[in-house]
Amino acid sequence: MKQSSIDKLSRVYNFLEKEEQSGMAELIKEVLRAESQQMNCNTKFDIYKFVLPKDKYRTQLQGVFYDGEYRVATDQIKLIAQKGEWPEELQGKIVKSDGSIIDGHFPNWRSLIPKDMTPYKPHKIDKAAVAAKIEAFRLEHKAEYGKSTQWCDEWRIDIDGVLFSAKHLWTILSTGIDTLYIHEREQYRAAIVSNDEFWGAIMPVVK
């Protein structure tokens, strides 16, 4: 439901309350509460941020793959698998944001899951510090080029000597994950992220 429709419903609810039409007012109140919860959910996390932008050669990565208890999205730089209970009819399918089905084969994302996490060192990420660094990048960009920009591909965040794209790292942090696991000996391997709801990976930037 669009925000304009929600605003109209709110006005109707206020009118019905004044007219003491409590039954209808309560019904509209429930609709507004449900829509508010849905909007909060959508604001919290959007898995389609992780899909590949339009690419005629890799259309299978432009949707979300439903695989058992996970739904998975990747753009080949970062990957996120969200745990939950998903509709049975979507199992094994790749679904675009508009609900249409993509005909294609999704990569074997489970092959990225390390069999042994021992070589991976945890790094706690300070989201506020990352946000401050990104804001500094934006100010520097504006000072140099005379115009502001939301993102630039050259912006990097250094974590224990390993570089990551600022944009992709920030998207990973949108899941609420705050710890990055980096392989101690092979730092160009994908770094691993996980919590109770998500499992994911992000590729470092090759120097």
Regions found by a protein language model. Give the residues of each.
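Short amphipathic alpha-helical heptad-repeat segments
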Residues: 1-17
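Short intrinsically disordered terminal tails
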Residues: 1-3, 39, 207
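Residues that form generic nucleotide/phosphate-binding pockets
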Residues: 15, 50-51, 133, 172
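Intrinsically disordered, low-complexity linker/loop segments enriched in Gly/Pro
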Residues: 17-82
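C-terminal functional regions that serve as terminal interaction/effector modules
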Residues: 75-79, 83-207
